[in-house]
From Swiss-Prot:
Keyword tags: Cell inner membrane, Cell membrane, Chaperone, Membrane, Protein transport, Transmembrane, Transmembrane helix, Transport
Name of the protein this chain belongs to: Membrane protein insertase YidC
CDD domains hit by this protein: 5TM_YidC_Alb3, EcYidC-like_peri
Gene designation: yidC
Segments of skewed composition (Low complexity): 58-68
Record lineage: Bacteria, Pseudomonadati, Thermodesulfobacteriota, Desulfovibrionia, Desulfovibrionales
Family (UniProt): Belongs to the OXA1/ALB3/YidC family. Type 1 subfamily.
Transmembrane domains' residue ranges: 7-27, 346-366, 415-435, 495-515
PANTHER family: CYTOCHROME C OXIDASE ASSEMBLY PROTEIN COX18, MITOCHONDRIAL, OXA1
Region (Disordered): 43-70
Pfam families: 60KD_IMP (PF02096), YidC_periplas (PF14849)
GO annotations of cellular component type: plasma membrane
Principal location: membrane
């Protein structure tokens, strides 16, 4: 809910800014003021064959030869990340991204998606009938660390036993993706047929930077074709419990995520926030194992950045993790356009400016009609005022006379409002697109203040540290307001006068990329209004 408040504020402000005077004139209204030990087998493919070549794996020990081994750490190193597992259960201890740092400062640490606090809640742990196997089972590990340099895939096989059930966890790693695939094989070792509940866990601490009001960590899941989320406050109070139909679920912020996706269809999903750790569970409610036989269960884990191109190539509907709200159909092409312009400009700030110019050109005809209608309405204000004075006690007659006046002069009272309102979905789509574009994270525009070494717009996903752009944006709004026909009513005029101040304070902590968009849009609007005034 907290992440939607800025959007609601912008929408309400825009409606007040654009529509109040037209709606009040149209209706004849009088204006009113104003959220143990383990088993794993590690094998790496080293041949010069293509990646599609089968991965060589060591066979797991037979059930009769199972012997627990001493627990240790198992490291998986790929070009994209470094992961450290505990052989006691195959749970994650660390997961560090190699291409992303915590800040833009030199020597900043790499982004850690599984911290020691989260590791204490057993991320990628296996639950058998609700019991933590990483604590209660005996585990065997026979293998080495994995180092994948792009020439092949690799696997880890963790084997454990508990309560007459042997579980073999095979984790598959691809050096070109953040997706980790797992196949769990359950085998009866006690000669008893049984039904078991198999659950997989995933844990992480907050993925958002401290003080990131527009980049909140939340729990999310994909169910019945819809992306759904819940805030940290709701998680603390009630948690999340979805009884069926979840394709994937986990934790995410604007730029990173850690989610699980069952391979064999949608399953129940649960999530809680306790002690600063987000913990989610996907559980298969009933898995049948015949006496002496086996059953299998598959799941995928995506722990990494929300890069649109990577997610589009992923299974399990993971591309739906990029959620832009109601205006997704606008946000996605706008973000694609942003990346296209960046491929030529080499600077995301410049790409935002080019995209803003393009959007402005597309809406140029609508803006022309709006400005023209506003000018016509301004000319009719004296006559409208006379009608109000004459029929002030008879609202119905007054409205009829006002409408007759508009009809006589062929003026549409909504003509200045509607073209502007049509642009609001585009603004909101671009707002969400820029807010969730990981491409803008740590992307510089003007890295230093001109003629100085002072760091300025070195990160378009962060606020302007000196508030220069939001203040200039407020000034452009004030100038734009001066060029716009003023409302006839003094109360309306006062409301409009304060709008630049409201917007300036609202944009002070907005990501710089969003402020640059709105600033450039204002400058272009001023240019268009000036041109219209000269033409008229």
């Amino acid at each position: 809910m907290e992440n939607k408040r800025p959007i609601i504020a912008v929408v309400l402000s825009l409606f007040v800014l654009i529509g109040w005077s037209y709606l009040s004139e149209f209706m004849g209204w009088t204006p009113a003021p104003a959220p143990v030990e383990q088993n794993a087998t590690a094998v790496q493919q080293k041949a010069s064959e293509p990646v599609a070549q089968p991965v060589q794996t060591a066979s797991a020990p037979a059930a009769s030869s199972f012997a627990p081994t001493e627990g240790r750490e198992v490291k998986v190193d790929t070009p994209l990340y470094t992961a450290v597992f505990q052989s006691q259960g195959g749970v994650l201890k660390h997961f560090r991204l190699k291409k992303y740092t915590e800040s833009i400062e030199e020597g900043a640490p790499l982004v850690e998606l599984v911290t020691p606090e989260a590791a204490g809640k057993a991320p990628m742990g296996l639950l058998l009938n609700g019991q933590p196997t990483w604590k209660l089972a005996a585990w065997q590990f026979e293998g080495d660390d994995l180092k994948l340099d792009g020439s092949g895939k690799g696997e880890l096989v963790f084997v454990g036993e508990m309560d007459g059930v042997r579980f073999e966890r095979t984790l598959s790693f691809d050096p070109e993706t953040y997706l980790i695939s797992e196949k769990v094989r359950l085998t009866d070792t006690a000669g008893v047929s049984r039904d078991v509940r198999l659950g997989m866990t995933l844990s992480t601490t907050s993925l958002s930077p401290e003080g990131g009001a527009y980049n909140l960590t939340r729990m999310a899941w994909y169910q019945d074709g819809f992306h759904q989320e819940t805030s940290a406050d709701d998680l603390r109070e009630t948690g999340v419990k979805v009884d069926e139909g979840v394709n994937w679920g986990g934790v995410m912020c604007n730029y990173f995520m850690a989610v699980m996706a069952p391979a064999e269809g949608a399953l129940p999903f649960k999530g809680v926030l306790e002690g600063g750790v987000y913990r989610s569970v996907v559980e298969n409610s009933s898995l049948s194992i015949a006496s002496g036989s086996s059953a299998e269960f598959g799941i995928g884990y995506y722990i990494g950045p929300k890069e649109s191109d990577r997610l589009a190539a992923m299974p399990y509907h993971l591309d739906e993790a990029l959620n832009y709200g109601w205006f997704t159909f606008l946000a996605k092409p706008l973000v694609s356009g942003l990346k296209f312009f960046y491929s030529y400009a080499g600077n995301y700030g410049v790409a935002i400016i080019i995209l803003t110019i393009l959007v402005k050109l597309l809406f140029w005809p609508l803006s022309q009609k709006s400005y023209k209608s506003m000018e016509q309405m301004k000319k009719l204000q004296p006559m409208v005022q006379k009608i109000k004075e004459k029929y002030g006690d008879d609202r119905q007659r007054m409205n009829q006379e006002v409408m007759e006046l508009y009809k006589t002069y062929k003026v549409n009272p909504a003509g200045g409002c509607l073209p502007m309102l049509l642009q609001i979905p585009v603004f909101l789509g671009l707002y969400q697109g820029l807010l969730n574009a990981i491409e803008l994270r740590h992307a510089p525009f003007i890295a230093h203040l001109p003629f100085t070494d002072i760091v300025w717009l070195a990160d378009l996903s962060a606020k302007d540290p000196f508030y220069i752009t939001p203040v200039v944006m407020g000034a452009t709004m004030l100038l734009q307001q001066r060029l716009t026909p003023a409302p006839a009513d003094p109360t309306q005029a006062k409301i409009m006068m304060f709008m630049p101040v409201v917007f300036t304070f609202m944009f002070l902590n907005f990501p710089a990329g969003l402020v640059v968009y709105w600033l450039v849009n204002n400058v272009l609007s001023i240019g268009q209004q000036w041109w219209m005034l000269r033409k008229s």
